[in-house]
From Swiss-Prot:
A motif (JAMM motif) lies at residues 173-186. It comes from Alkalilimnicola ehrlichii (strain ATCC BAA-1101 / DSM 17681 / MLHE-1). This is UPF0758 protein Mlg_2664. Belongs to the UPF0758 family. The lineage of its organism: Bacteria, Pseudomonadati, Pseudomonadota, Gammaproteobacteria, Chromatiales. Zn(2+) binds at H173, H175, D186. It holds the Pfam family UPF0758_N. Keywords: Hydrolase, Metal-binding, Metalloprotease, Protease, Zinc.
Amino acid sequence: MAITDWPAGERPREKLLERGAGALSDAELLAIFLRTGRQGLSAVDLARELLEAFGGLRPLLEADLDRFCDHLGLGPAKFTQLQAVLEMARRHLHAGLERGEALTSPEQVARYLTARLRHQSREIFACLFLDNRHRVVRYEELFQGTIDAASVYPREVVQRALAHNAAAVILAHNHPSGVAEPSVADQALTRRLQEALGLVDIRVLDHFVVGDGRPVSFAERGLM
């Protein structure tokens, strides 16, 4: 049955307009993006097929061009559209942290860092540099590869913080495995950076580990 033959309240577009995007399933959201299905499949049916083939929404969104286009119903045009949508979402979150408002919500920071780091295929260590009113001065990705006390140089983090005249820092890195549980090495690294930044009176407010689901906050865990 074509989507146009569905009850109005069950059609993805009408459902979104009536109840908001949060009321839609992953398949329904993807169907709106796809716009059309293929012979014998509605856009929602195609969306369900693709989600099953990729293993969920996140792997689909993070697929490279070759893997994305390997599926019937997808091609370079859809890939570029999707990348544009994802980049707009990241920039929207970034702009929200650049409006000069003080950071008061860990959820706000977690959403931003998730958008920045979750899609990365390798470990990245980043810093949010803040002024004395906890407003974002700069976001920087400083190190890539295996993130541990041997590969992240406290002196360089201190230099970047001083260059931005930061009064505080929020640390972040991702676990490409998807498991956001802080490791012993993560905790040791955090202590080293706290000590180094403390020598120049710069506070480390938190350290987020980004994986699948909600990022883990060291501050909320009582690890700092």
